[in-house]
Amino acid sequence: FILLTRRVFSAAERILIMKLPLIDYRQFRLSRLNTPQFRHLKLLLFWPIFSLVFCYLENYRPTVYYAPMRCALDHWIPFCKWFVIPYAFWFLFVGGMLLYTLFYNIPAFRRMMWFIILTYSFALVTYLLFPNCQHLRPTLLGGDLLTRFTAKLYAADTNTNVCPSIHVIGSFAVYFAARDIRRFRAKGWRLGFLTMAVLISLSTVFLKQHSVLDVLA
């Protein structure tokens, strides 16, 4: 995983150095938001809307019954603290692809954002109509760095609204975006992005953040 991450960062650095952005965002003004040059930025408004709705569902909605998500396979999957690394890398994985497409491939940015808008909105509707949770987290033992980091993750992230998994959806949004970009269509790139998406998806069940059902959903 570390070698793969280094390769991704090294390649991304070379790409950023070699290419100039398609649009000079220093020229952006709110008055120009509806112009052909900048109107794709309106898609970014989804993020604060999603965050507000998700925050409400997590912290402020009236008390409801949360259906526990579990299946027999969950109990065969051991907890593995090492998976906190790809789990945390998800934020860079998704954010990095959004930034890359925003600067260097506007059509791919639009398609990735619409994929996220549709799938994340579906997830929010599911959380609203079918409140769900998981009770799979183990008692953490030990004081090493990875265990402490996982403990902080557990403390910051509730065990509710887990199916479908936003981590899995976001990971494959990046993979599909990579397939959509000519620079990343080489077999090595596609395999790298797919491997990372699968690792992040696996991390959700090995960290006991999600049931296998959440991943499949």
Label the model's feature ranges.
Residues R185-V198:
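Short hydrophobic alpha-helices at membrane interfaces in multi-pass membrane enzymes
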Residues F93-M97, F172-F176, M196-L202:
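Hydrophobic, membrane-inserted alpha-helices
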Residues P86-F93, I166-A173, L216-A217:
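Membrane-embedded alpha-helical segments of multi-pass membrane proteins
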Residues L52-V53, Y120-T126, T195-V205:
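Aromatic-anchored segments of alpha-helical transmembrane domains
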